[in-house]
């Protein structure tokens, strides 16, 4: 009695858990169907027999099935054929795989291994969610692959003769879901994602989108599991987020239990993923993820501090101490309204105070205190130091811990106490057991009590050295008081203020912070990458299909501006301006002011010259754009001389903000700092303290990042700028805000080359600072699928004037590209 083989659909195991964003070439055409039919049966003796028929022969024979019995071959009329469905379809697709890959065996596998693998796959049930058509396609494909490997050497290859197995494989479109199902089951996740993304670009994929998305979601789950196994939590989290986006993109997939399981897993993984992302190197590539992690940490803290909200974190002291240890001092200060929380903590009988002690223990709050002192001292920010003093007073009242020295030190910095008082408190601290408590918090060994106490030594060892952004700051108290400035709180010297990642708001007050109605994004949404692209990519010249496909991109910002941006950009005049800005983005022309004709120590200004050619790829100022027509547009713009006209630059600025802001300011200002330095060279100069000059430049860089950043703090420009520089930068920042775009800046390196102070007969005292800056930035525009990025190393000369209140303000600048 012969044994007939039927192969039911088999699943892939859902592993609830990689990142795979590859793209591969994918060929789809529609030749006449030429498929060989091959049927394999096994006799009672266990031997396999095969017979092949072409599709045309099957049609002539009336779709008859061969069956082997007793060594003879009999024809059974009107029996169903697994190839019958192919006759109705002439659309085929090429898969970049071999038959061996489809069943999960190596190319060296013997025939018995092939049969065993097929039998094992046959016994496995399909994953929940696949359609019946996908199950049938999987069965047909599985049997077809087995037959080809057993009886057709072209597909099996020959190891001895070094003949590779045939690839790619051409199959009907109806078999694609079955192929993806098999590939996912045998562990070919990356192939599933590559083939799935490529297939979605073709119109023929429309009937199979449900099964394609499901296969891709399961592949991402498998990748996530592999990432978790090697402790790559953030990669696994992002893979799960991708799987979630695939399932949410199709209504029929949203009903699966798999989606619920993924969402629950993401909630549980939010805390460890936050720690993992905070531990990433502080590079421009990781800046976006780090901002998301900080926003997620803020949201987790909000949930923990809220009496009504629930949170996944069980051991708060352990979690929060690890998180704080991975933050910069400025990030700690901007994370929460710490002084308000400290005041709430004083009322020991309140429910909020009790709940806060569970979430934020004394050790964490002490590190927060040191962070405030570090930021306040390094940036000479009296308001931040005053907050540190408030925290001291509240912790003394609520915890009963002796923090008299820290309080006295803050009073000394605020000129509310003497150095002698602070030094006396330090001596008392060194001589009692409280110093051991502090050292244990900081993870330091106890210092010998015989050493002479020093405020500067304590400041360096116990405060500044604890945070990466203040570690290199000088602990000199003399410098602090010599050039003391009272900057507003938002002038951080290490990095721009940390805003709410989604809503672009500053940290809220305590009442607002614990009010869940003020927060529309969960920690999971904060951690989800903003660049999750829709898996549905329309085919070329198929806008109609693109419009009908669902988008699964996960938005982070609710403030998506839809005020006819596309109408503006697609208008003729705006399009010309857009092309012009792209040319500027693409590293074209800066106004380099040539200094020549140096006679008797005088600098004479040269006419502004504009280069008519784009910079080469080796130029240090390199814009990265995803536009395929960038080079073509750039050449066209340069030939027409659009970038050579200052008025046109101003008009383009009103249309869109897309260029390195320093360069755009210089062009639109129509004035160079050289004109002022000309007169300065004739006057008596005296050196300016390098640290003070560096501090001023850093202050300006931070203000620039805030004014052109997501919060558009245009008002802050007037605190550091004056004259024409203020007008031009205000125009630029206001235009960016009006166009709903903003810049993200990362200052990588700053070096003051020279700094001088001179007397200006008209304006009083003025200064000239020449600095070398290394900077990276990203232009964020919600209307564009990709953000323009640049990396630049440039030398810049600033002219500053001293105001009546004793503060310096930048008036003019002259930027030069470094080759």
Swiss-Prot record:
Chloroplast intermembrane topological segments: 594-819
Keywords: Chloroplast, Coiled coil, Membrane, Plastid, Plastid inner membrane, Transit peptide, Transmembrane, Transmembrane helix
Stromal side: 77-572
Expression across tissues: Exclusively expressed in young green tissues such as young cotyledons, shoot apex, emerging leaves and budding inflorescence.
Transit peptide per record: 1-76
Subcellular location: Plastid, Chloroplast inner membrane
GO BP field: chloroplast fission; chloroplast organization; plastid fission
Record-level GO cellular component terms: chloroplast; chloroplast inner membrane; plastid inner membrane
Chain coiled-coil ranges: 419-439, 762-782
Disruption phenotype: Defects of chloroplast and FtsZ filament morphology (e.g. long FtsZ filaments formed by multiple rings or spirals); elongated chloroplasts with multiple division sites. Aberrant stromule biogenesis in the leaf epidermis associated with giant and pleomorphic amoeboid chloroplasts, typically having one or more constrictions as well as one or more extremely long stromules. Reduced number of enlarged etioplasts in cotyledons associated with the formation of multiple FtsZ-rings.
PANTHER family (UniProt xref): PLASTID DIVISION PROTEIN CDP1, CHLOROPLASTIC, PLASTID DIVISION PROTEIN CDP1, CHLOROPLASTIC-RELATED
Official protein name in the record: Plastid division protein CDP1, chloroplastic
Species per Swiss-Prot/TrEMBL record: Arabidopsis thaliana (Mouse-ear cress)
């Amino acid at each position: 009695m012969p044994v007939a083989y039927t192969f039911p659909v088999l699943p892939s195991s859902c592993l609830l858990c990689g990142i795979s964003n590859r793209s591969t070439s994918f060929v789809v055409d529609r030749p006449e169907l030429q498929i060989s039919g091959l049927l394999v049966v096994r006799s009672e003796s266990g031997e396999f027999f095969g017979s092949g028929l072409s599709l045309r022969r099957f049609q002539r024979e009336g779709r008859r099935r061969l069956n082997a019995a007793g060594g003879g071959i009999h024809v059974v009329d009107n029996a169903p054929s697994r190839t019958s469905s192919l006759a109705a379809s002439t659309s085929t697709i090429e898969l970049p795989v071999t038959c061996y890959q489809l069943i999960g065996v190596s190319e060296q596998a013997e025939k018995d291994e092939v049969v065993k693998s097929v039998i094992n796959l046959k016994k496995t049930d399909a994953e929940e969610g696949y359609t019946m058509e996908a199950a049938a396609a999987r069965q047909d494909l599985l049997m077809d692959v087995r037959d080809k490997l057993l009886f057709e050497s072209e597909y099996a290859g020959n190891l001895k003769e070094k003949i590779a197995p045939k690839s790619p494989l051409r199959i009907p479109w109806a078999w694609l879901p079955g192929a993806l199902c098999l590939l996912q089951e045998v562990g070919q996740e990356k192939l599933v994602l590559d083939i799935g993304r490529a297939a979605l670009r073709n119109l023929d994929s429309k009937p199979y989108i449900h099964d394609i998305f499901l296969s891709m979601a399961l592949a991402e789950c498998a990748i996530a599991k592999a990432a978790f196994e090697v402790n790559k939590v953030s990669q696994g989290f992002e893979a799960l987020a991708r799987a979630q986006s695939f399932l949410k993109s199709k209504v029929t997939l949203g009903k699966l239990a798999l989606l619920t399981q993924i969402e629950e897993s993401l909630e549980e993984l939010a805390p460890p993923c936050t720690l993992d992302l905070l531990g990433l190197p502080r590079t421009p590539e990781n800046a976006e993820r780090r901002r998301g992690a900080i926003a997620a940490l803020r949201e987790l803290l909000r949930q923990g501090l809220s009496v009504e909200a629930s949170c996944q974190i069980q051991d708060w002291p352990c979690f929060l101490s690890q998180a704080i240890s991975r933050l910069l001092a400025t990030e700690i200060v901007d994370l929460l309204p710490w002084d308000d929380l400290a005041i709430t903590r004083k009322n020991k009988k309140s429910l909020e105070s009790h709940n806060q002690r569970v979430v934020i223990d004394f050790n964490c709050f002490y590190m927060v205190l040191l962070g405030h002192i570090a930021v306040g001292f390094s940036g000479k920010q009296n308001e931040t130091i005053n907050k540190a003093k408030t925290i001291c007073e509240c912790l003394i009242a609520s915890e009963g811990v002796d923090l008299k020295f820290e309080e006295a030190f803050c009073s000394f910095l605020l000129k509310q106490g003497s150095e002698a008082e602070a030094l006396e408190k330090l001596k008392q601290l060194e001589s009692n057991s409280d110093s051991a408590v502090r050292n244990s918090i900081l993870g330091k060994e106890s210092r010998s009590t015989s050493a002479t106490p020093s405020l500067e030594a304590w400041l360096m060892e116990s405060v500044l050295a604890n945070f990466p952004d203040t570690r290199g700051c000088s602990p000199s108290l003399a410098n602090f008081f010599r050039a003391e400035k009272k900057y507003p709180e938002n002038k951080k010297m290490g990095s721009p203020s940390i805003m709410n990642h989604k809503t672009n708001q500053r940290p809220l007050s305590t009442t607002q912070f614990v009010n869940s109605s003020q927060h529309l994004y969960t920690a999971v949404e904060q951690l989800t990458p903003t660049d999750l692209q829709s898996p549905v990519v329309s085919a070329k010249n198929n806008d109609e299909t693109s419009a009908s496909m669902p988008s699964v991109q996960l938005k982070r910002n609710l403030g998506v501006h839809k005020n006819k941006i596309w109408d503006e950009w697609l208008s003729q005049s705006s399009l010309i301006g857009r092309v012009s800005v792209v040319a500027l983005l693409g590293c074209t022309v800066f106004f380099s002011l040539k200094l020549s004709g140096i006679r008797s120590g005088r600098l004479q200004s040269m006419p502004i010259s504009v280069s008519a050619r784009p910079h080469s790829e080796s130029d240090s100022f390199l814009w990265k754009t995803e536009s395929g027509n960038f080079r073509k547009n750039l050449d066209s713009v340069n030939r027409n001389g659009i970038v050579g006209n200052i008025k046109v630059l101003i008009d383009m600025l009103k249309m869109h903000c897309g260029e390195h802001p320093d360069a755009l300011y210089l062009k639109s200002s129509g004035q160079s700092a050289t004109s002022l330095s000309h007169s300065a060279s004739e006057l008596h100069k005296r050196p300016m303290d390098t640290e003070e000059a560096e501090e001023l430049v850093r202050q300006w860089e931070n203000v620039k990042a805030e004014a052109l950043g997501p919060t558009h703090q245009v008002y802050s420009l007037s605190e550091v700028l004056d004259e024409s520089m203020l007008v031009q930068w205000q125009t630029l920042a206001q235009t960016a805000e009006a166009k709903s775009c903003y810049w993200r800046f990362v200052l990588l390196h700053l070096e003051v080359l020279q700094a001088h102070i001179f007397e200006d007969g008209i304006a009083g005292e003025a200064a000239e600072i020449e600095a070398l800056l290394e900077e990276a930035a990203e232009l964020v525009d919600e209307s564009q699928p990709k953000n323009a990025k640049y990396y630049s190393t440039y030398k810049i000369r600033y002219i500053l004037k001293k105001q009546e209140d004793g503060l310096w303000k930048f008036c003019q600048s002259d930027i030069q590209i470094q080759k």
